[in-house]
Amino acid sequence: MGSPRLAALLLSQPLLFICLAVSAQVACPCLPRWTSHCLLAFRVDKHFAGLQCGWFPLLVRKSKSSHEFEVCWRHWTPSPFQRKLLGSPSLSQESHRISTHFLAISHRGLRTKRTQPSAAEGIEHLPGAGSQKHGGPEFSFDLLPEVQAIRVTIPPGPEANVRLCYQWALECEDMSSPFDTQKIVSGGHTVDLPYEFLLPCMCIEASYLQEDTVRHKKCPFRSWPEAYGSDFWKSIRFTDYSQHSQMVMALTLRCPLKLEASLCWRQDPVTPCKILPNATAKESEGWYILENVDLHPQLCFKFSFENSSHVECPHQSGSLPSWTVSMDTQAQQLILHFSTRTYATFSAAWSNPGLGLDSSMTPVYSISQTQGSVPVTLNLIIPFLRQGSCILVWRSDVQFAWKHLLCPDVSHRHLGLLILALLGLTTLLGVVLVLFCRRLLPGPGRTRPVLLLHAADSEAQRRLVGALAELLRTALGGGRDVIVDLWEGTHVARIGPLPWLWAARERVAREQGTVLLLWSCAGPSTACSGDPQTASLRTLSCAAPRQLLLAYFSRLCAKGDIPGPLRALPRYRLLRDLPRLLRALDARPATLATSWSHLGAKECLKSRLELCHLLELEAAKDDYHGSTNSPCGFSCL
């Protein structure tokens, strides 16, 4: 056993087994899962007296550099050589040194893993090892959840390489791109390492830049509640493989954790998922399987770990359900129509609608489809119980099934007559309300008349009053009526002036119209006596249904000629204040714009204004000649 050649021969056998396992891609429980192939060669170096070294080059596919095992021993190595060399992590003699370099290639790519010398003798041969700690670089960190990053601080000293990884049994796997970067940090500086998900197995790893240095790793998030929140469940990929009566879901985890899964049912997306008794799924290498389940969108898996849980409904991918049910009523029977795409047995039983899904009553009616072609439609006829009852329908050939609660409505036969009666009543009520409102409440489209009061005692003044009335009717538009005695001479002569005036006043009050008083300086009158005139004017103001509007022609009456009792009324000088007067008479701008927009409407209004202007001049000449023979008095024009 002291021969170097014999030792090399014995050592080559386990190494050859390792490489053959790698080449054949055989999974070994004690080795990482490798995907590359290697070739093994052994060479014995005889140049050193008393010390024999052997190198085992490893030619790794898709790698630019070669890696090798280096084994050194002295000729006096105690027996058995194989046990002390391969079975013991540290040899009993300080003079024995084992330095190995090997590759561990995981499913995420190529990564070099190094073991360190077991004694201080090996550390002295490392470059720059005198300035490093044997335990790797120290560092501190801060979690920055708002930016999804971890800030790592390296104390003053040499540069260090830092990274984030997910700790598995044999290695700390890199994160997915673009979070798999490694950053070099100078001593006394900080660096932010972004992460995709905050998970309990996430670790922070730091190492110096020299070859074969120890990596210092911290995995502090196992006890952090934040690591089991929404990020934990977002990082898991759920894949549904459910079919027939088997509920299957495969999980792809980023952490080596074992979750618990139970069957639950959820009434709607906002209510909690209620766990069913004795419905725990079996787990096998990330696959969760539950047998004898009716695949329904409201039957879900509830995964839990520690104090965190997540509900995943595997059959909500948009595919059609395996079976559906509809119902129809005929005479005293209820007919259930089952459409199924698989062999199944369906049952139904009457239930009280107030007791929910657990209140089925006997008897139970069933129908099966166990042979023949599918899909198929099955009809189950059930005697009608009573009005207001509901029926439970479920798949009875499985252990876990969702129950449908159907409540037949037999009132649809009278629904047409009821709707027709309601429509007739609604229409009648609407007509009555419209008529009532049109009678009592004047709408915005109803016309309001204008009562024009005057005291024209000459032919020129009467022509001027008629022209003013025609001008107001044309300018107001919208069918507005102007009431003046000159246009109703026959009616005034038949009933008399005073009855006509009171009838016109009542109409204006009923239709919420306006009284316009036209004032001018007339010939001799008893109005100059003072008190009788004041009393008559006050009586006229009180008798008006609304506040009086006073208008006067500037050539027939001056502002100071208006009596004192009437000076408190709104006054309008014609024809200068005609726009203000029209607004006071509730002339709508939309009506004016519509009427004036017709062809010739502006020309008609212009001709009315010119006629009023000419008649005003003619009446002023007549008043001037009459005033030379008698004093001036006040009167209505």
Curated annotation (Swiss-Prot):
Q: Pfam families annotated for this entry?
A: IL17_R_N, SEFIR
Task: Using the record, list the residue span of the signal peptide; answer none if the entry has no such feature.
Answer: 1-24
Q: Which residues lie on this side of the membrane: Cytoplasmic?
A: 437-637
Which terms in the Gene Ontology molecular function aspect does this entry carry? interleukin-17 receptor activity
Please give the Gene3D superfamilies that the UniProt record associates with this protein: 3.40.50.11530
GO CC terms: plasma membrane
Q: Where is it localised?
A: Cell membrane
Predominant subcellular localization, coarse grouping: membrane
Tell me which residues are glycosylated.
Answer: N278, N307
A single GO BP annotation from the record?
inflammatory response
Keyword terms = Cell membrane, Glycoprotein, Inflammatory response, Membrane, Receptor, Signal, Transmembrane, Transmembrane helix
- Spell out the coiled coil positions from the record: none
Chain ranges sitting on the Extracellular side read 25-415
Membrane-spanning intervals of the chain: 416-436
Q: Could you confirm whether the keyword Glycoprotein appears in this record? A: yes
State the annotated membrane topology for this chain.
Single-pass type I membrane protein
Question: Which residue numbers delimit the SEFIR domain?
Answer: 447-583
Describe, as the record does, how this protein assembles with itself and its partners: Forms heterodimers with IL17RE; the heterodimer binds IL17C.
Task performed by this protein: Specific functional receptor for IL17C, signaling through the NF-kappa-B and MAPK pathways. Requires TRAF3IP2 /ACT1 for signaling. Crucial regulator in innate immunity to bacterial pathogens.
State the name under which the record lists this protein. Interleukin-17 receptor E
Q: Which organism is it from?
A: Rattus norvegicus
- Gene encoding this polypeptide? Il17re
